[in-house]
Design a protein with these regions (language model features):
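Single, function-defining residue in the core of a domain
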Residues: 1, 11, 15-20, 27-35, ...
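Short secondary-structure boundary/capping segments
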Residues: 38-39
Length: 277
């Protein structure tokens, strides 16, 4: 609770076209190698090192972790992401704030999109080549930026062995970007093309890299895996203390050096523009 309260009260002035950008991603790490933890939380039978799995929501532009779910062993990232979306959407500190949620290709699912739509939240997602058939059809087409209609009937859900209780009909905007390898990357969103042209969608997804940088600092600067406790409750507390330290450091550095430009991650800048439709 202390972590969430301090994150909510911290200054968060930076936005993208008036919107907060929230990236969601997961991180795995090692737990202390005790007999008790090794017996319960090893990733595989051959591996004797117990692990944890954490899924976090990161305010990209303000470089702040605002929510996180800590799980012993391997977790269902989509399930934990859904719980965080519910929590943020109902939190008095966040629910009325304009926000865009960003996900890498391991997260998109019908249920996650339904949840975001039900909460009236905007999103940008990178999708895999085995997503909804309508999105796959767009991938095979020559379109670059196109709105498609999704109709997920009860019959379709049964045939695909998918549990669906949310919105069954909705529109998705598909955006194609070209990677340096020559492959196409498909992003899906519910942001309007007039307000957010293709270049903005690409930039929003590019900014997702901030959460990867945050995880890197947690592991290599805050040393999140260097636990003090050996009990499960204590280990969880140690983890959230690491997030507190990260957020405090961000606030202090931001207030002391507000005008220092950040180093650009050039590896994500090499996306080529495709010709328009």
């Amino acid at each position: 609770e202390l972590f969430e309260q301090t994150a909510a009260s911290a200054p968060k002035d930076k936005r993208f076209h008036g919107y907060h950008l929230y990236a969601v991603d997961g991180m795995k790490g090692e737990l202390p190698k005790t007999p008790e933890l090794s017996a319960k939380y090893c990733e595989t039978e051959k591996c004797k090192t117990p692990v944890f799995h954490a899924v976090s929501t990161f305010d990209i532009l303000n470089e702040m972790f605002i929510r996180s779910k800590f799980h012993f062993g391997i977790a269902d990232e989509r399930e934990l992401a859904g719980k965080m979306i519910d929590a943020v959407a109902q939190d008095v500190y966040y629910k009325d704030e304009p926000q865009i949620w960003i996900f890498d290709r391991g997260f998109p699912s019908l249920s996650l999109i339904q949840k975001l739509l039900e909460h009236r939240l905007y999103f940008v997602m990178r999708v895999s080549s085995s997503f909804l058939k309508e999105v796959n059809a767009f991938r095979k087409s020559k379109y670059v930026d196109r709105v498609i209609h999704i109709e997920y009937s009860e019959c379709r859900a049964t045939q695909n062995h998918v549990h669906s209780e949310g919105i069954s009909q909705f529109d998705l905007r598909c955006v194609r970007v070209k990677l340096p390898s020559g492959e196409d990357e498909i992003l899906v969103t519910n942001l309007d093309r007039k307000d957010f042209p293709k270049r903005d969608i690409k930039e929003i997804y590019r900014l997702r890299w901030g959460i990867e940088t945050g995880f890197n600092y947690l592991k290599n600067a805050v040393f999140v895996e260097e636990f003090v406790s050996k009990t499960e409750n204590g280990l969880a507390q140690d983890y959230f203390v690491s997030l507190l330290i990260y957020n405090f450091a961000t606030c202090i550095c931001g207030s002391m050096y507000p005008n220092i430009p950040k180093k650009e991650n050039t590896s994500t800048r090499s996306i080529e523009e495709l010709p328009p439709d």
